Curated annotation (Swiss-Prot):
SMART domains: FBD (SM00579). It comes from the Eukaryota. It holds the Pfam family F-box. One of its GO terms (biological process) is anther dehiscence. This is F-box/LRR-repeat protein At3g62440. Keywords: Leucine-rich repeat, Repeat. It comes from Arabidopsis thaliana.
Length: 457
């Protein structure tokens, strides 16, 4: 007994979390200190995918048996039912079978109890295509700081007294929002006055009924991630606005709407973009008249780190190059242009007068598919004059094979980048082949005497 009593409070609380409510009640008779500590339940977990695990009914009974004075730090409930296998399955990337209405009632009974117990971390994954509705108490909890909701159900409206005064992190997975009188999504953000991080995963904006505005004065990190890239209907995908003046980080993966009506991203420091027009993926002739992403592009003017994940994203910058701002603060640029033309590269370099690090995520580009095989360099980079005034210090290339044509293009980089200090290339070469690759690079003339090479296998 003395050995256990001498343990720190957090260890005793952890031990107590494995006891049933009945067992915990018996142990509290042994010590006043234990009585106080065992009213704290660090975690409540239920996962229907665990084979031979606790049943939903047993979990609900366990929650309902919690003493009125108990406090719950974290709830994690993952549930759906697969009728074909008569067992619960859980996978965030697959579509599950629907949960039965009777099970909805059981789940919500337990949620209401936990929400009254001072819960801080609330994770709920319940598949409810056929009418699941979150209890209103989710949107009036004063203690929750981290809220994660999924998957497949809709949030139609919030209660009039909706307020989450402590919520800092909100994650939404395949959740849809509608509006009945007022926009549920807008109301949720407005009811979270200290929200700092928002993740919207599996988003299909065009299927929502909403204000088409992401608005939060406190938000610092925003992740928007589309999962489904087929069967896209843009008939009701006209515009999106961002009013997030404190946002420092943006990850944005989606189709481009027809227009960004209003964009406030003045505090943005780091941006990662994966954007494409409609289902054809590539920008084509006439798209500059059908789309207007200019407000978004101007909203990026203060970024310091910019990652353009795809050729489609880089091409958007090229198509609207006349309207691009100068990115005075941009010091780190990553681009993935695959084997396509680098037409956007000279323009991006010129628009970033203080660029220090360029990461080419992929191979060097030395010829176009539309030119004869004898041409080493594509017209888009043939002169390389855009490099002369670039203050680049670090050049990284994630796919390098050491071919003659790659060496010739590398020669152009090295001869014109007078501030270059490090060239880092990633190669699968090993042994003597790697030594030859390094030796070939070392023989190239350099405008910068400080330039060193690093080959990463």
């Amino acid at each position: 007994m003395d050995r256990i009593s001498n343990l720190p409070d957090e260890i005793i609380c952890h031990i107590g979390s494995f006891l049933s409510a009945r067992e915990a009640a018996f142990t509290t008779v042994l010590s006043k200190r234990w009585h106080n500590l065992f009213t704290i339940v660090p975690d409540l977990h239920f996962d229907s995918s665990v084979k031979d695990g606790e049943s939903l009914t047993d979990f609900v009974d366990r929650v309902m048996a919690l003493p009125a004075s108990s406090r719950v730090n974290k709830l994690s409930l993952k549930w759906w039912f697969d009728e074909d296998t008569d067992s619960a399955q859980f996978d965030e990337d697959t579509e599950p079978e629907d949960t039965e209405p009777a099970q909805f009632d059981q789940i919500n009974r337990s949620l209401r109890v936990v929400l009254k117990r001072g819960v801080a971390d609330f994770y709920l994954w319940v598949h409810g295509k056929q009418g699941y509705t979150l209890p209103f108490e989710v949107f009036t909890c004063e203690t929750v700081t981290k809220l994660s909701l999924g998957s497949g159900f809709a949030i139609d409206f919030l209660p009039e007294n909706a307020l989450l005064p402590a919520l800092k992190t909100l994650s939404l997975y395949h959740v849809r929002f509608y509006e009945f009188g007022r926009c549920a999504f807008k109301t949720l953000l407005a009811s979270s006055p200290v929200l700092e991080e928002l993740t919207v995963c599996g988003v299909n904006w065009e299927l929502w009924k909403w204000s088409r505005t992401v608005s939060s004065s406190s938000l610092k990190r925003l992740t928007i991630m589309r999962k489904q890239w087929d069967a896209f209907d843009d008939s009701d995908f006209k515009s999106i606005s961002f009013d997030t003046p404190s946002l420092a980080y943006l990850y944005y993966s989606d189709y481009v709407p027809k227009e960004y009506l209003s964009v406030n991203l003045d505090s943005l420091v780091e941006t990662k973009l994966y954007l494409c027009p409609e289902e054809n993926y590539m920008w084509g002739k006439g798209d500059e008249k059908r789309f207007n992403p200019i407000n978004l592009l101007h909203g990026l003017k203060n970024v310091e780190t910019l990652n353009l994940y795809t050729i489609m994203t880089a091409e958007m910058f090229y198509v609207f190059r006349e309207a691009l701002p100068v990115f005075q603060k941009l010091s780190h640029l990553s681009v993935n242009l695959s084997n396509f033309c680098w037409s956007s590269m000279p323009m991006l370099i010129k628009k970033a007068p203080n660029l220090k690090t360029l990461n080419i995520d992929g191979p060097l580009h030395y010829e176009s598919y539309y030119r004869c095989a004898g041409d080493i360099f594509c017209e888009c980079v043939s002169e390389y004059s855009f490099l002369v005034s670039c203050p680049l210090e670090v050049l990284k290339i994630t796919e390098y094979y050491g071919s003659f044509r790659e060496l010739m293009q590398m020669k152009h980089f090295l001869e014109k980048l007078s501030c270059l200090e490090l060239v880092e290339v990633h190669s699968q070469a090993t042994g003597e082949r790697k030594l030859k690759l390094i030796a070939d690079l070392e023989r190239l003339p350099r405008a910068s005497s400080k330039c060193k090479f690093e080959v990463v296998s």
